Amino acid sequence: MLLHLAATETYYQMNTFDGMKWDSWSAEVKKKWDIPMNLGEPARKAIKGNSLDYYLDALHQVREKSLAEFRKRDDKWLATVVTEEDFSANNYAKWFHVAEHESNHDGQIKFLKRRLPGAKDTSE
């Protein structure tokens, strides 16, 4: 799930900060991020065997880039509307979606953590 969040944020970085059309990224980028982005059976087979720190570090690196890029931008950039094919959205809406996406998965992560053997009841 953490790598999925990193993948989502990476794709939105390229779309909003770099001005790339959705899904126009290089084969190298797709090779690294498509499986965690799309999840499903391919992700279940490929994303395993790493320590928690591996996944946290991946998300941290992506997040640091987002924060650095946001520091370069202003409200005018947030309000900028970009149209791709039949879809229009401003950068604020795109990043609001990223935040909502993470919030949703955070709930899933908390749900799963409470069900791990030996987990303490945190009543969050």
Regions found by a protein language model. Give the residues of each.
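Acidic/histidine-rich alpha-helical segments that form the ligand environment
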Residues: 35-78, 94-98
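Short, contiguous alpha-helical
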Residues: 1-38, 81-124
